[in-house]
Amino acid sequence: MRRVVLMMSTSIDGFVTGPRGHAGALPEPEELKRWKLERIRRAGTHIMGRVTYEEMAAHWPTSTDDYAAPMNAIPKVVFSKTLDEATWPESSVARGDLADEIASLRRQPGGEIIAWGGADFAQSLSRAGLVDQYVLVIQPVAFGGGLPMFRDLPDALRLDLIESQTFDTGTVLHIYRPSDQASPPGG
């Protein structure tokens, strides 16, 4: 059974975006970029909410960035009740119950399922207990407010740190799994 891996970038104070919207691009350490590219290339499916889908679908098809090829080639599922169709190649729309749709994706063959967010989608996955691994890239910036990574959780989300890496820029990569889970397949 495939695992769901949530990949998110946050500020040191836990916000996905600042009080005025999008966080903006901070310099990405080359070592982190190589790590992320390898992880993305191994993925079997990318999942995301509508807003993230629309941002990515507008960017990746014409991008020359190193991430573009795997982002365009790997199947993507956008979770939305309002999106009529997914026009980004290798994309489809899931409109059913979140837990049922994720269960169906887990049963399919292939690599891990990477969830990209946005924050509302990430929170829905977390509240439903559907995330097997959290890959958090903590940027060396504080927003003092904005859109939080976690909110409205029914209970405390207890996590076990399974990997941590610090980069010269001050960016830190933390990988967690929910404390109540045994080691998921592949990690």
Predicted features, each with a name:
Residues M1-G187:
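Enzymes that bind and transform nitrogen-containing heteroaromatic metabolites
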